[in-house]
Amino acid sequence: MAGKGRIIFHIDMNSFYASVEMAYDPSLRGKPIAVAGNVKERKGIIVTCSYEARARGVKTTMPVWRAKRLCPELIVVPPNFDRYRSSSKEMFSILREYTDLVEPVSIDEGYMDITDTPHSHRAYETAEDIQARLQKELLLPSSIGIAPNKFLAKMASDMKKPLGITILRKRELPDVLWPLPIEEMHGIGTKTAEKIKTLGIKTIGDLAKGDEHALKTLLGINGPRLKDKANGIHPAEVNPERIYEFKSVGNSSTLSHDSADWDELTGVFDRLALSVSERLQRKEVMACRLFIMIRYADWKTVTRSMTLSNPADQKKDIMEAAMELFDKHWNQNPVRLLGITGTELVEKQQAYKQLDLFSFKEDAKDEPIFQMMNELNEKYGQNLIRKGAVIKKEESKTRGTSFNRDFFQDEKKR
C-alpha cells in the first residue's frame, strides 16, 4: 500500500506487577500496594507500586522503610515472576487476535501494526476494545498510543496514564510534543540529555530544529536519528522477530608469544574487557550473553559462553564473566590468542535489570550503574533491577533480559 500511512499502536500495561497482584487478590484493589523483595528487611526496595501508593509519594527504588513512613498503610508484597509471565502471555495473545504484526518490547509492553487489517478504519474504537478486553478478561489496566510510527506511538501512550488512549498525529507535534523537556523524549537518557543541552537544546522542539551537523559531531549517527524522531520521522517497522535479532561486539588479541602465565593472560582479558565495554557503551547497547575464545599454541580453538542474568556494558561485569569462563575451561596449556564477544545486544533503553533486593545499598553506590538504574525506573518503573550477577547456563540458547528472557523464549516457541 504505497503512500498509505501506517497505524501503529503502542500498548503499555499500567503498573504491571502491582496490577497483576491486584488481579490475583481482589482485596488489594484500590489500596496502596507495592511490589518489593525481602519485604521484612529495611533495605528492601520498591520495585513498582500502585497509583494509590504513588499518590502518597511512594516511588520506584525507594527503600521500603521510607515508603512505609510516607504511607503507613502501604501493603508490600513479594514479586511473583511466574504470575507476571503468565499474565503477559495472555496479554500478548489478546493483541494477536487483532493482527499478526505484534512486536513485544518487554514483558509488559509491545507494538501493533493494524494498517492492513479490517480494524484500520476504526483505530480508536479498536484501541478501546483492546483496552476493555485487557481490563475485563485479565483485570489489567493499560494505556495505548496511536500514531503513524513506533516512536510517536510510544510517546502517545505515555501521555495519559492510567487507562489512557492517545492519538498523536504529525501535524500536532508543534503543539503537543515539541514543548516537552528533552528528558521526556523516548530514547534519550540522562547522559544523552546532558550532552544535548550543551548545544542549547532544552525541549523536543529545540531538537527538531537543531543543527544536524552539530548533533552528529556530538552524538555520532544517533544525533540525526534523534532529530528525525523529534520531527516525527521513524521508519522502523513493527517486527515480531526483532527481539530475537542476533548482534555482537567482540575483540580478540594474539599474544606476542605463547603463554601459560595466569597473570599475563588475566592482563590480556582485562584489556579485552575494557575494549568491549567501550564499544558497547559507544553503541549504547548492552550484552545479554558473553563468549570467550581460547586458541592454544597448537591452534586448537575453544569457545565457551554464558548467559548474563542482567545485560552488561561495564568492564568489571564483562571481566568477571570472562574470567569465570576462562578459569573453568582453560586446560593450563600455553595460549596463543584470547577473545571476548558480547552477543544478544539490547538497547540501553530496553535493558531491564532484575533487582537484587538484598544488595541494593551496595548496588546503589556503583556509578554509573546507579544512574542508569534511576533512569530505567523513571521511564520503566514496573521493571525489576538487579546488579550484575551471572547465571551459569553455558551453551544456553535463551534470549531477552532478566526473567523477560524466559518469557520471550516461550514467545518464540509459540
Swiss-Prot record:
Concerning CDD domains, the annotation shows: PolY_Pol_IV_kappa (cd03586)
Q: How is the cofactor bound?
A: Binds 2 magnesium ions per subunit.
Where is the protein found, in the record's own terms? Cytoplasm
Q: Which GO terms describe its biological process?
A: DNA-templated DNA replication; error-prone translesion synthesis; SOS response
Which segments constitute the UmuC domain? Answer: 8-189
Which co-factors does it depend on?
Mg(2+)
Locate the active site: 109
State the UniProt keywords alphabetically: Cytoplasm, DNA damage, DNA repair, DNA replication, DNA-binding, DNA-directed DNA polymerase, Magnesium, Metal-binding, Mutator protein, Nucleotidyltransferase, Transferase
InterPro entries on file? DNA/RNA_pol_sf, DNA_pol_Y-fam_lit_finger_sf, DNA_pol_Y-fam_little_finger, DNA_polymerase-Y, DNApol_IV, PolY_HhH_motif, Rev_trsase/Diguanyl_cyclase, UmuC
The entry assigns this protein to a family as follows: Belongs to the DNA polymerase type-Y family.
Assembly and interactions?
Monomer.
Q: Relate the protein's function as given in its record.
A: Poorly processive, error-prone DNA polymerase involved in untargeted mutagenesis. Copies undamaged DNA at stalled replication forks, which arise in vivo from mismatched or misaligned primer ends. These misaligned primers can be extended by PolIV. Exhibits no 3'-5' exonuclease (proofreading) activity. May be involved in translesional synthesis, in conjunction with the beta clamp from PolIII.
Name the chain's protein.
Answer: DNA polymerase IV
